Structure formats: structure tokens, C-alpha cells
């Protein structure tokens, strides 16, 4: 008989603690081993109970949830899901939670939810099961002098013509994985489009933070943005991102079509459009994440002549999306996270020499 997933619930609201206990008790695979109303009680229970997964509130008495998580990850690393009211959580707090080590951030459940408790329960239980399998200590990006201003390198007019294009898919663990990946790319990075699963309102701050770290431009994509070397475009939350072609140039097309794999943006939309318009001049990468988004799109890119890579299991926080891509035969190579950028650059050199 499989071992149950042992969960510790940390929230100052007795109502939320009871609601989460009710949700978890409906699943035979999950056992609530304890609850805590503040971080100090939670610390003692973490040490005593050694849970597989901790659910954590952000706003709590005596110490906020993010500060507590930072301490937990230093001294007692634990797979953590942050439950927060995303409408109240500022984008900086959201990103800080991910940087501190949260594997997932979910909308805090409430008693007066418009969706049924059954639907809500299914989503939360699915996340807990996936997070229970996650790696706690993925590879971290080494970015020199993160506080120092980064000099941007303008693209030349020649570089603005159509050539190579890079499409990247990432989800759970992806915000940190993207930093590792991008830290290996040069200032004249090929025109790059990224789909990172994030709620609306948070992708802009994420892009702005990345822009401060690297010598190339990183921005949240807008309708009509041109895809050029030296620029990385992040799909905005709640919008699918595709590309279209006009003459020798590629442009961003945003829309709010149906969610795919329960997500919007979905990488499959992007990668299928890249396969259609760019073909063999493209490269595709699927990084860490739950589910299977990007797998079919990466396969279409490969079949169109693009070079494709999936992150290996050992360096993923959650080996879901890359596993799905590998299972379809969509990846030319399966590589550790810190080797993907270098491999793509070698591939570019080979293409340019041909």
C-alpha cells in the first residue's frame, strides 16, 4: 500500500484550516498530520512531524509567511504551497514567494467560493499530489552583481531581420529555471518567446525583474511586438501568445481563446505557430512544470525541422511537461538545466556556419 502524503496546514484563520482539513480528508492518499496558526507553532511542528508538504498563508501574526518560508528552506527544506488571495498579494510578494522556495502559489479557498467545493477540492488535491513529488533544491542561477545596473546592447538593423527564433515553455519551478537558462545566453540572444504559467498581473513584474538581471531586453509581450535578437518576450497572464509573419519579420499575436490544458497562456499555442511560420529556423525548449503543455507544440516544431530540447528529470522541480515531450518523441535532446543554453548556442554556431 502506497504511503500517504503527509500535510501540515499553516494558516491563522481557523475557518481556512478547517476547510483545508475537510478537502484533504476527502482524499485517501493525503493525511493531515498537523495544523498551525502561526509560524512559531509551525516551526515546532515541522521539526516534530516532518511533513511531505506544507500549505502556508502569507499574512500571519508574529511573522509573515514569506519570511518564515525563507527560514524553513535554510534550515528544514519542505515542499511548500502558498495559499494567498492573489488579488491582495502584490506581484513583488508573489515573486518573492517563488524565490524563497514555494513550489506552487494558489488562490486561497474561501467558504463563499462561487465554484463548487468539489471542483475546488479536486484542484487543490491535484496540486498537493504533484508538489509531493517535486524536488526541493533545484539548480539556482548565478547572476553576477544582481544589484548592479546591467548594460543593454542594442540590436543592429541587420540583426532585426528574420533569422533564428527561440520558443520556451515552463511552469512549476520555471521562474527560477528561466533565470538559470537565460544566464547562459549572450546579449544578442535569438529573438525569444517564453510561456511561463502565471496568473494575470504578475508576468509584467516578472519580466521587469528579469530585465534588470541580463544584458538583453526582457519585457511582457504586447500585441504587435516584433521578435528580434536581443529581446525576450514573456506571454502575459490570461493571454495566449502566438506569432505571425509579415515579410521578413515576426510579430506577436495575443488572444484570449479557450484555456488549453487548463492554462492560459498555453505554450502549445505558441509552439504550433512557431512550427507553422518559422519551421527549421526555430529552436524549442520545454522546462520544468506540471502537466503536458508544450509537448505537442514541441513535436510540431521538431517535425517542421526545428531543434528541440527538454529539461532532464534530475534538474526539474516537477518532471511533468518535459516528461510528456520526451514520451511523444518531441525532444532531439534531453539535458540538465544548466547545459541547455550552451547546447543551443553550439547549435546556432553550426547553423550559422552552414
Swiss-Prot record:
The secretion signal range is none
**Alphabetically ordered keywords of this record:** Chemotaxis, Cytoplasm, Hydrolase, Phosphoprotein
Write out the PTM section of this UniProt entry.
Phosphorylated by CheA. Phosphorylation of the N-terminal regulatory domain activates the methylesterase activity.
Q: Does the keyword S-adenosyl-L-methionine apply?
A: no
The record's active-site residues are 171, 197, 293
Question: Taking every annotated instance into account, which residue ranges of this chain make up the domain Response regulatory?
Answer: 6-123
| Reactions catalysed | [protein]-L-glutamate 5-O-methyl ester + H2O = L-glutamyl-[protein] + methanol + H(+); L-glutaminyl-[protein] + H2O = L-glutamyl-[protein] + NH4(+)
One biological process term from GO is: chemotaxis
Major localization class: cytoplasm
What are its E.C. numbers?
Answer: 3.1.1.61, 3.5.1.44
At the top level of its lineage, which domain of life is listed? Answer: Bacteria
What's in the domain note?
A: Contains a C-terminal catalytic domain, and an N-terminal region which modulates catalytic activity.
Q: Give the UniProt family note.
A: Belongs to the CheB family.
Q: Which NCBIfam families match?
A: PRK00742.1, PRK12555.1
Stated name of the protein:
Protein-glutamate methylesterase/protein-glutamine glutaminase
Q: Organism source for this protein?
A: Bdellovibrio bacteriovorus (strain ATCC 15356 / DSM 50701 / NCIMB 9529 / HD100)
Amino acid at each position: 500500500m502506497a504511503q500517504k502524503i503527509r500535510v501540515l496546514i499553516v494558516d491563522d484563520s481557523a475557518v481556512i484550516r478547517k476547510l483545508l482539513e475537510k478537502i484533504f480528508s476527502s482524499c485517501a492518499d493525503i493525511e493531515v498530520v498537523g495544523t498551525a496558526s502561526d509560524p512559531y507553532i509551525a516551526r515546532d511542528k515541522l521539526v516534530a512531524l516532518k511533513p511531505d508538504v506544507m500549505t502556508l498563508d502569507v499574512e500571519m501574526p508574529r511573522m509573515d509567511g514569506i519570511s518564515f518560508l525563507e527560514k524553513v528552506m535554510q534550515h528544514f527544506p519542505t515542499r511548500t504551497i502558498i495559499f494567498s488571495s492573489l488579488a491582495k498579494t502584490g506581484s513583488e510578494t508573489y515573486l518573492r514567494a517563488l524565490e524563497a522556495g514555494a513550489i506552487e502559489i494558489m488562490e486561497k479557498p474561501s467558504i463563499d467560493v462561487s465554484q463548487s467545493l468539489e471542483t475546488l477540492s479536486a484542484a487543490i488535491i491535484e496540486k498537493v499530489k504533484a508538489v509531493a513529488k517535486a524536488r526541493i533544491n533545484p539548480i539556482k542561477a548565478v547572476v553576477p552583481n544582481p544589484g548592479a545596473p546591467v548594460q543593454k546592447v542594442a540590436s543592429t538593423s541587420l540583426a532585426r531581420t528574420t533569422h533564428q527564433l527561440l520558443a520556451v515553455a515552463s511552469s512549476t519551478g520555471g521562474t527560477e529555471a528561466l533565470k538559470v537558462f537565460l544566464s547562459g545566453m549572450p546579449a544578442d540572444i535569438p529573438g525569444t518567446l517564453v510561456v511561463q504559467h502565471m496568473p494575470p498581473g504578475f508576468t509584467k513584474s516578472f519580466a521587469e525583474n528579469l530585465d534588470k538581471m541580463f544584458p538583453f531586453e526582457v519585457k511582457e509581450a504586447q500585441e504587435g511586438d516584433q521578435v528580434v535578437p536581443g529581446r525576450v518576450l514573456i506571454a502575459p497572464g490570461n493571454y495566449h501568445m502566438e506569432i505571425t509573419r509579415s515579410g521578413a519579420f515576426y510579430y506577436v499575436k495575443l488572444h484570449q481563446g479557450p484555456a488549453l490544458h487548463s492554462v492560459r497562456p498555453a505554450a502549445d499555442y505558441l509552439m504550433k505557430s512557431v512550427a507553422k511560420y518559422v519551421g527549421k529556423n526555430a529552436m524549442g525548449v520545454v522546462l520544468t512544470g506540471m502537466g503536458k503543455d508544450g509537448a505537442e507544440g514541441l513535436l510540431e516544431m521538431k517535425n517542421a525541422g526545428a531543434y528541440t530540447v527538454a529539461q532532464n528529470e534530475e534538474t526539474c522541480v516537477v518532471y511533468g511537461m518535459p516528461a510528456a515531450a520526451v514520451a511523444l518523441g518531441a525532444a532531439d535532446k534531453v539535458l540538465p538545466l544548466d547545459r541547455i543554453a550552451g547546447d543551443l548556442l553550439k547549435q546556432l554556431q553550426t547553423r550559422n556556419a552552414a
